[in-house]
Curated annotation (Swiss-Prot):
Associated pathway: Mycotoxin biosynthesis
SUPFAM superfamilies xref list: alpha/beta-Hydrolases
Keyword Protease assigned: no
Entry's Gene Ontology molecular function annotations: hydrolase activity
Lineage start: Eukaryota, Fungi, Dikarya, Ascomycota, Pezizomycotina
Family: Belongs to the AB hydrolase superfamily. AKT2 hydrolase family.
Disrupted-gene phenotype: Abolishes the production of ACT-toxin and impairs the formation of lesions on leaves sprayed with conidia. Does not affect growth rate of cultures, sporulation, and spore germination.
Subcellular location: Peroxisome
Name this polypeptide is given: Abhydrolase domain-containing protein ACTT2-1
EC number: 3.1.1.-
Length: 262
């Protein structure tokens, strides 16, 4: 894929983007992680109670109007346009009422799809549906241990009132990310920084989408694009503009240089 490529992810998506940046080394030129679900074992999924919250969450209503009212109450802090999109795409009519103008509706994403983000569905392999030990997903903790292997500049964009990106969590992210200089080229710059959106929680991109977008655009435009255009992109263009003959000549000169150094 042609660079530059920017990775952007929120919550579990932030964890997945960060994981991809390590497992597919140097795929991103930079990444922006919004309140990512990344933390040490004491901050892992087993400690957050997300499974209990999911089981308590209502997923069905008698009418679409009831569902809309419930969602607007639960997500009252969200930007109105974002909330309208949530309501439009997150509920659907139950199969038996498709032909009716109104009737029972359900969430498009059911409890199972959400629960498997937090708890491993071990019954799929064992066939034993009940009685098994609960095993939480380890992705956020795994990624925490891999932060040192991140190979690109990283911006952490956090909600000022978020219970996930606490000052302690942000301190760990900033100190560990890209600390090992893994696969770093000579002269390559890797910035790691944070931005805080005041008066927002974990759902900051839904609560303040414009402010988040402005911060992301500023990071990409003023920082990362400048670095890319001045250094990495320029170097790549020099190589692409060479003929095959000149590329071979450069390779031979490089080999001779190595013989004098090794």
């Amino acid at each position: 894929m042609q660079q530059p490529i920017v990775g952007v992810g929120h919550s579990m998506g932030g964890c997945q983007i960060a994981t991809l940046s390590v497992t597919s080394r140097r795929i991103f030129s930079t990444m922006i992680l919004l309140d990512p679900a990344i933390g040490p074992p004491e901050m892992g999924l087993a400690t957050l109670g997300l499974g209990q919250l999911t089981l308590r969450r209502r997923t069905q209503w008698l009418t679409r109007e009831d569902a809309e009212k419930a969602l607007r109450t639960s997500f009252s802090t969200w930007d109105p346009q974002v909330l309208d999109l949530l309501i439009k795409h997150s509920i659907h009519s139950d199969k038996q009422s498709v032909e009716m103008e109104d009737g029972p509706v359900s969430l498009v994403t059911g409890r199972y799809q959400e629960l498997v983000n937090y708890i491993k569905p071990s019954f799929i392999r064992s066939g034993k549906v009940v009685g098994q030990e609960l095993v939480h997903q380890t992705g956020p903790v795994d990624m925490y241990h891999m932060l040192g292997l991140v190979t690109c500049s990283t911006l952490y964009l956090c909600g000022g009132e978020s219970t996930l990106s606490t000052p302690r969590a942000r301190e760990l992210w900033l100190s560990r990310t890209a600390e090992l200089s893994y696969s770093k080229d000579p002269g390559e710059m890797r910035k790691v920084d944070e931005r805080i959106v005041p008066d927002t929680g974990h759902f900051l991109p839904m609560e303040e989408p414009k402010e988040c977008a402005d911060i992301i655009a500023d990071w990409i435009d003023k920082d990362e694009c400048m670095i890319w255009n001045c250094h990495i992109g320029k170097q790549g263009n020099i190589w692409r503009d060479l003929s095959n003959t000149n590329r071979k000549m450069n390779a031979e000169v490089w080999i001779e240089y190595l013989q004098s150094k090794l």
